[in-house]
């Protein structure tokens, strides 16, 4: 029996930066199905836990929203403790047969922590306070690191500029940029 699969859903670049006690997380708005752009203004950033955290997602949208719902429940269960909620979600992601099939990543920032929860159930805390996920993430990450090192731009400005650079390079990233700040 021949296995046929649906076109791969590719969408997004999400980047978050913490600088001088301020955090910003932003994304582009493009969603593609195979080689076709199906939406230009997808909302990929959410405020969580009484507005104290920002979370963004990349990957299959329904999968990402499922994970965000579960993450929010973990935040509530653990009193808003970002690291504990992230580790518990990652543990569930690795051990639950249903969750293991979900294809998404989540980037989360608070004013002092930046984490990535990967599609393999890993919790990653970058040393430099910059998180990036999605198809244009490496372009945005390189831009953000350079801007952090060589400018005095705010976290919000670094996120904005990094996404603009990624949009100029990555075909799965557009310039419909949304940035949220804490």
Curated annotation (Swiss-Prot):
Write out the catalytic residues in the record. 12
For this protein, the record's PROSITE patterns field holds: PROTEASOME_BETA_2
- SUPFAM superfamilies named among the record's database cross-references: N-terminal nucleophile aminohydrolases (Ntn hydrolases) (SSF56235)
Regions crossing the membrane: none
Catalytic activity of the protein? ATP-dependent cleavage of peptide bonds with broad specificity
UniProt keyword Cytoplasm, yes or no:
yes
Please summarize the record's notes on activators and inhibitors of this protein: Allosterically activated by HslU binding.
Identify the residues that bind Na(+). 167, 170, 173
GO MF, one term, reads:
metal ion binding
Instruction: Offer one example of a GO biological process linked to this entry.
Output: proteolysis involved in protein catabolic process
Classification via InterPro entries: ATP-dep_Prtase_HsIV_su (IPR022281), Ntn_hydrolases_N (IPR029055), Proteasome_sua/b (IPR001353), Proteasome_suB-type (IPR023333)
EC id: 3.4.25.2
Keyword Nuclease (UniProt)? no
| CDD domains named among the record's database cross-references | protease_HslV
Origin: domain of life: Bacteria
Sum up the protein's function in the record's words.
Answer: Protease subunit of a proteasome-like degradation complex believed to be a general protein degrading machinery.
Q: Which NCBIfam families match?
A: ATP_dep_HslV, PRK05456.1
Q: What is this protein called?
A: ATP-dependent protease subunit HslV
């Amino acid at each position: 029996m021949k296995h046929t699969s649906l076109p791969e859903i590719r969408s997004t670049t999400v980047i978050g930066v913490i600088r001088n006690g301020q955090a910003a997380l932003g994304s582009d708005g493009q969603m593609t199905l195979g080689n076709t752009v199906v939406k230009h203004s997808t909302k990929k950033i959410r405020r969580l836990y009484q507005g104290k955290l920002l979370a963004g997602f990349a990957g299959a949208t329904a999968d990402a929203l499922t994970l965000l719902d579960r993450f929010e429940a973990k935040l509530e269960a653990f009193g808003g403790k970002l690291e504990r909620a992230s580790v518990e979600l990652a543990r569930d992601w690795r051990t639950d047969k249903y969750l293991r099939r979900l294809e998404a990543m989540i980037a989360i920032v608070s004013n002092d922590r930046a984490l990535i929860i990967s599609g393999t159930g890993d919790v990653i805390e970058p040393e430099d306070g910059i998180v990036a996920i999605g198809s244009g993430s490496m372009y945005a990450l390189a831009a953000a690191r350079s801007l952090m090192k060589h400018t005095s731009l705010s976290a919000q400005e670094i996120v904005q500029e990094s996404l603009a650079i990624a949009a100029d390079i990555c075909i799965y990233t557009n310039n419909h940029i949304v940035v949220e700040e804490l």
